[in-house]
Amino acid sequence: IGWQGKWANTLRLWEAQPTTMFDLERFNRGDYAAAAEPEALARTLSRVLYPDDTTYQGKELRLKQEFFLTSAALQDILRRFKNRHSDLRALPKYAAIQMNDTHPAIAGPELIRLLMDENGMGFGDALEVAQQCLGYTNHTLLPEALERWATFTFGNVLPRHMQIVERIDAWH
């Protein structure tokens, strides 16, 4: 319970679940490992947070995890907002989204993507809403704590977000 015993914050715990549990056709062909692969890969997103990223696969999984957790939180914020309000351009009056590390930095492009692609907002309005809603604080300047993604990896894992980042760069 928070300030003056009147407020409680909600803690959301996200779990990745597969869209297909088991490929019976592959199983019946004798490819047992491949039959279970879609489920195993999906659950890997939320099974162990922040894997060793010294390999390309580790870097890719980490980026997927950061996207998954950030997107889930943003989608929940938008869902709750739309239950009470009709104009998403008013979101900054009701939501302040604070990022306290580099891990959720994908929130900018993801919020813009959700507003544009899922809710039909134009780029200029979506960018303005994101700028007004999102805040960022980092508590260290150590290079190893400041995450960066190779353009190839980022574009391969999140091609739509790469387009949005390039559009933001061109806008400014």
Tell where the protein language model's regions lie, with residue ranges.
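A conserved ligand/cofactor-binding region detector
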Residues: 1-172
